[in-house]
Amino acid sequence: MPEYEGNCLCKAIHLKAIIEEPKLSCCHCETCRIWCSSPFMAFSCTQKPSVSENENVGKYASSSFAERIFCKNCGTTLYFAYTNGKNPYFINAWLFKGIENITFDAQVCIDDKPDCYDFANKTSMFTVDEVMKSIVK
């Protein structure tokens, strides 16, 4: 399986992740939109990404079931992780260079999406309720 490498904007954090398939998904939930100033666009990853651990790695528990990992220095969004360790990790898709044949596959929390934008791509769409039911406890 292909392993990709990327950095945050200030290059203080180096990240490696195995991306099984370059299928892009995005989350329209309010928390992701505030976190990223847009929908969070990510690749799903079954293995925890390898991150150069240092004082710049920040973790924020955004809910009782998830945390968000970011660079404390430049603010780059790195990834979203369920705290149960069973669900996939969602890695910022734009950290990596050289990923080919990316497809826009899914939109989650579609019922939280504001009316002011739409993506033209045909994707699978999941509501907040469907996402919450899919989380392995």
UniProtKB/Swiss-Prot annotation:
EC number: 4.-.-.-
GO molecular function, one term: S-(hydroxymethyl)glutathione synthase activity
Domain CENP-V/GFA stretches: 4-118
Note on how the cofactor is bound: Binds 2 Zn(2+) ions per subunit.
Organism for this UniProt entry: Schizosaccharomyces pombe (strain 972 / ATCC 24843) (Fission yeast)
GO (cellular component) term, any one: nucleus
Annotated protein name in UniProt: Uncharacterized lyase C29B12.13
Cross-referenced Pfam families: GFA
Claim: Nucleus is one of the keywords in the record: yes
InterPro entries (UniProt xref): CENP-V/GFA (IPR006913), Mss4-like_sf (IPR011057)
SUPFAM superfamilies, per the entry: Mss4-like
Binding site for Zn(2+) 2: 27, 29, 32
Cofactor(s) essential for the protein: Zn(2+)
Alphabetic keyword roster: Cytoplasm, Lyase, Metal-binding, Nucleus, Zinc
